[in-house]
Amino acid sequence: MERESVCVLGGGSTKYGKLDDSISDITLQASVGAIESAGIEPKEIEAGYISNVFGVADKQVHLGPVVMSNLGISECPSLSIESACGSGSVSFREAFANVAAGFYDAVLVTGTEKVTHTGTDWTTTYFSYCSDFFYEGQAGASFPGLFASMARAYLNEFDATEEDLA
């Protein structure tokens, strides 16, 4: 399949905010919404790319096989993707590349996080584990802090304004 032939057929989401449902249920709800809006059946899905970083906070990691099983397609290959802030983008890229290469015609890409119940200290600490903890994390660097430092360096290097970044 040509890259130009790859498209997004549907999308799904849950409500935003503090949800009582488990991370597995939240992921399933969003996945079902995407499948329904695409106008396909779960059995038409040939692979799943499920992104999640903080599943451990809800006592559930390796969401790929869990989601596919809950959709009734446990035989469908899936990949659980954990790539910090880029998890959703990495999932989308992998799905796009595999469809464009002709490996699959229909795939599911879902990204889910649930950290409203963890507290800021836990979440910030866990996020620091996504970087090189012994080099950056122990120094107190966090992704928001690192992103801010890079933005500030860009502004200084190129004599840009905050509006230029917006």
Can you describe what each PLM-predicted range is?
Residues 5-7, 12, 83, 97, ...:
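Short, flexible coil/turn micro-motifs enriched in small/turn-prone residues
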